[in-house]
Amino acid sequence: MINVNHERTMTVARKRGFLWSSFEIYSGVAGFVDYGPLGATLKNKIMNRWREFYVVREGFYEIESPTIMPEEALKASGHVDHFNDPMTQCKECMDVYRADHIIEDATGRDVEGLENQELTEIISDEGIRCPRCGGHLTHVWSYNLMFQTLIGARGKKTGYLRPETAQGIFIPFKRLLRFFRNRLPFGVVQLGKSYRNEISPRQGVIRLREFTQAEAEIFVDPEHKTHPDFEEVKEDILRLYPAGRQMEESGTVDMTAAEALEAGVISSEVLTYHLCLAKRFLMDIGIPEDALRFRQHLPSEMAHYAIDCWDVEAFTDSYGWIEIIGIADRTDYDLRSHSQHSGEDLRVFIEYDEPRRIRKRAVKPDMGKLGPKFRKDAARIASALSEVDVEEIEKALDEEGRFILEGEFEILPDDVSFEDVEEVVTGRKVYPHVIEPSFGIDRIIYTLLLHSLVDDGERTYFRLPPHVAPVEVTVLPLVNREEMVMTALEIERNLRRSGFIAEFDSSGTIGRRYARADEIGVPFAVTVDHETLEDGTVTLRNRDDCSQVRVKIEELVPTLEKLRG
């Protein structure tokens, strides 16, 4: 069993300036957290490390979009209609709860994905009462998780705080496609705040109303979901918990990436590659391999936009296995939906190696109907119809009795006909499919702190890798003699100017100062002592094993650069 301690971790994190409850002097507000000086530095280092993986190494580009979005954009994405949690309320004390969570707490049953009526019946059949006062609970209803606001002083335009960063990438897709010279595949990332008005956020950093995401949207040809670098990761071991094994309750299975792909456990090569990349990132920042597993979404919990989705989960002692990353194949849902709602063609033209003769289904506008109906717009509408996916038009007419073009013009079954035609084509137009790794930065930081804390009875410290530690080196004069203090201050100044996050500490005994630095995860301590004044060398101490070596002052920077990695 993995040995971690939530209470001890959070005690140290609060005490030493990593994480604090927000608005403490006003009794606090659930679902919000402050990052103290060390926490904010750690967070920025992790986000920058993420950029190294996804922007520098993968060659993706980062954009930044507004955190407030208009209602029509989120209507198109499905969030207005589908971004809901099941809620119930106590009839006596009026406290509200997530219905699936209160059932799971009371019965141990996993009920995620069940319909509201089913949850209501379970609450009734099991006699589940309010945890606070024992009162009866109401029927279960859907509660939309988005924060609503009004845009502009007149208050006539509804907006929402964004529930994810992804939509800010999908909406400017036409400009992004042009930037990438109209070629697939390409990747775009965004890091920033997202917002979800959680019903009852009682799990600290695990369930926040304002949280930080790092998301990549990789646009790929639906017919070619491969990855050029798969060979580099094919032997990586993944601890998988596929949907089938969950339903059989048969536990996880360790497989190489190549084995998982060949067995059809993971749906595509590109998705498998990104599971491996996520694991490599987490291990790089210091989360141990045995604390991680990859759980596939069950059919009942699969997001409305996904055909395959895996959560990277981390073990915790207080919350069990928690999701810290979601990696999904979103198919063409987002681009197709935004195309339909906005009237913009968000397809990509993929050129064939040589022209092909094909038979295809074509739409034939009836100008005798469109002319009187749309007058001056008729010719443009006829042209626009020829650019729309014919299957999309036929499906809408069959299922809904109408097709809405460009979000405005209603096309009825009598307005068009369909025919099979033969033509020579030089390429095909497709909606790209999207592979999305979505990282919950706050949960990752919590997981890292939880699994980094060492409390062996003699010392308590965060064993953070040097490249993510918020303070990289502390400089200590052995005693408070002026010559030692001045030399230590000069070394600290030089380290900062050389790109290190360094601090100077002369308060208390040398043992107490080592302990203080260890506790916050400082990997290296430089001690200025009597020998320093004689021969220009300092003691360089390693946090993890307390080993010490003598280093010349002029060699300190290159030595630390090598150790930091």
From Swiss-Prot:
Residue sites binding substrate per the record: R98, E164, F211, T212, Q213, A214, E215, E436, P437, S438, F439, G440
GO BP, sorted A to Z: glycyl-tRNA aminoacylation
Organism whose genome encodes this protein: Methanothermobacter thermautotrophicus (strain ATCC 29096 / DSM 1053 / JCM 10044 / NBRC 100330 / Delta H)
Residues annotated as transmembrane: none
HAMAP family recorded: Gly_tRNA_synth_A
InterPro entries, alphabetized: aa-tRNA-synt_IIb (IPR002314), aa-tRNA-synth_II (IPR006195), aa-tRNA-synth_II/BPL/LPL (IPR045864), Anticodon-bd (IPR004154), Anticodon-bd_dom_sf (IPR036621), Gly-tRNA_synthase/POLG2 (IPR027031), Gly_tRNA_ligase_arc (IPR022960), GlyRS-like_core (IPR033731)
PROSITE patterns, per the entry: AA_TRNA_LIGASE_II (PS50862)
Molecular-function annotations in GO: ATP binding; glycine-tRNA ligase activity; protein dimerization activity
Coiled-coil residues: none
Pfam families according to UniProt: HGTP_anticodon, tRNA-synt_2b
A cellular component annotation (GO) from this entry: cytoplasm
Cited CDD domains: GlyRS-like_core (cd00774), GlyRS_anticodon (cd00858)
EC number: 6.1.1.14
Entry binding sites for ATP: 196-198, 206-211, 323-324, 440-443
Role of this protein: Catalyzes the attachment of glycine to tRNA(Gly).
Family: Belongs to the class-II aminoacyl-tRNA synthetase family.
Annotated localization: Cytoplasm
Annotated signal sequence range: none
Keywords annotated in UniProt: Aminoacyl-tRNA synthetase, ATP-binding, Cytoplasm, Ligase, Nucleotide-binding, Protein biosynthesis
Protein name as it appears in the record: Glycine--tRNA ligase
Catalysed reactions, as listed in the record: tRNA(Gly) + glycine + ATP = glycyl-tRNA(Gly) + AMP + diphosphate
